[in-house]
Amino acid sequence: LGSTLAEIWSREAWGKWSYVDDDLLKPHNVVRHIGKDCHIGKSKVDVVKELVDLNYHSGEKSIAIHAKINDSENPQVKEAIDNAELLVDVTTSIETARDLPTLANLTRIVSTFITPSGEDAVLLFEDKYQKIRVDALETQYYRAILNNDWGVKHLKKHLGAFKTGGGCRDISMVISDELIKL
């Protein structure tokens, strides 16, 4: 989802972006990532930077930082967070979602993700004055799932407690590429 958003926003010439991720592009990522087979083994952020910077010769060039976004000791990460007007969290890491409000205390955060079926998307966006931080919005989101009729279908195709790892390393689902781009 993150690379797709980067591609869309780049084509729209929206924003000057710093991409932060410590992951490498793996063969199973190519199905949904903008990276291609020839990029396997490379840093995901380097691949995203390379591809989105090709969209406009004279456009804003992005910055790629191969690190964890919650690595508060990394000077590049700290600078990227401190200089950001908006921090878009598209990670699948619960740890990251919990750390960002304290690391980005002056930077507005938006968190976005898709549900297991790929049929629903979620956008948690802090208000202009950050009266309600993204971690509190996430709690409200979970409460809404439990307390509304739509919550029953919202997480359909979730595999329950059977997991093989964490975040995007969980068991893969077959999701149409069109759903990712919608």
Each model region followed by its residue ranges:
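Glycine-rich phosphate-binding loop and adjoining beta1-alpha1-beta2 segment
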Residues: 22-60
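Glycine-rich phosphate/adenylate-binding loop
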Residues: 82-86, 90-182
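Flexible loop/turn segments at secondary-structure boundaries
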Residues: 2-3, 25-28, 69-73, 95-97, ...
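Glycine-rich adenosine-cofactor-binding loop
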Residues: 1-24
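S-adenosyl-L-methionine
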Residues: 53-76
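Extended hydrophobic-aromatic, low-complexity segments
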Residues: 19, 27-30, 41, 97-100, ...
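C-terminal structured domains
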Residues: 4, 68, 72-85
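Short His-Asn-centered micro-motif
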Residues: 1, 20-21, 67, 88-92, ...
